[in-house]
A protein has these predicted regions:
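Conserved "right-hand" nucleotidyltransferase catalytic core of DNA-directed polymerases
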Residues: 1-16, 21-29, 38, 113-114, ...
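Flexible, charged surface loops at secondary-structure boundaries
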Residues: 3-7, 55-61
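Active-site-proximal helix-loop-helix substrate-binding element of RNase H-like nuclease domains
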Residues: 21, 28, 32, 36-52, ...
Length: 241
């Protein structure tokens, strides 16, 4: 498994979505690009929701390349698509390579810039300036609003999503030769992707709670607090309210 060449498809992918507080993502669109065949897939919201499976194979012959994979895996989950067998995350790869080192310290020409760990900053760090999207924050806010979207707005979202996928593919080209620097190389990175699939399952399922008990506690919270205060104060006298 320690060779990228074994994969029939290496697919960079990105979803745009909206996630209301406490809810699972609502998918707005998806764009994917096979780095090997140079084939694109572009799906709007309705096309995503109407599909029962991914438009490309997700078996072990496909390597899915993401930047912050949990977000994309969550979208697979909510759409009911089969989870990809092999996933790598360029965000994780970059952190593994440079963790603890501010990126601007490593590049003299960027020493005056405070670089974060997001996609745009990673592109700058690796000299991929032409892929930096200056409208990224605005487009993220547009997607987060959740629609409904007219055809013009949906077209803009797909165009933005396409630019992120192109950037992810370009960043993969820069980082792929460095995978061998990891202690277990590609195997380690794929194991990290398997962990992110588990994280995605937890995020989509949510925190398991006893909801009837939670409701009862919430309805009686003031009395519970008063009882706790009285119990603690009997021994320590720390609450003077």
């Amino acid at each position: 498994m320690n060779s990228i060449r074994k994969f029939e498809r290496i697919i960079a992918i990105d979803f745009e979505f909206a996630t209301p507080p406490g809810e699972v993502p609502g998918v707005n669109c998806m764009v994917a690009y096979d780095i090997c065949s140079k084939r694109w897939w572009k799906l709007d919201q309705r096309e995503c929701l109407d599909r029962r499976s991914s438009p490309f194979p997700t078996d072990p012959s496909t390597l899915l390349v993401c930047f912050y994979a949990t977000a994309e895996l969550n979208c697979f989950k909510v759409l009911g698509w089969e989870m990809p067998a092999r996933v790598i995350d360029l965000f994780v790869l970059q952190r593994a390579l440079y963790n603890g080192l501010p990126l601007n310290w490593l590049k003299p020409d960027l020493e005056d810039q405070k670089l974060g760990r997001g996609l745009n900053d990673s592109l700058l760090f690796h000299g991929l300036h032409e892929f930096v999207n200056p409208e990224k924050k605005e487009m993220q806010q547009l997607s987060a609003a959740g629609g409904p979207f007219d055809s013009t707005t949906m077209g803009a979202l797909i165009e933005y999503c396409t630019s992120d996928v192109a950037a992810t593919a370009a960043l993969f080209g820069k980082l792929a030769p460095k995978i061998s620097q990891l202690p277990k190389g590609l195997d380690w990175l794929i194991y990290a992707g398997a962990y992110q699939k588990a994280v995605s399952s937890m995020e989509i399922r949510g925190v398991p709670i006893d909801y009837p008990l939670f409701t009862k506690m919430r309805e009686n919270w003031e009395g519970i607090k008063t009882g706790l205060i009285e119990k603690v104060n009997a021994n320590y006298g720390v609450f003077g309210g």
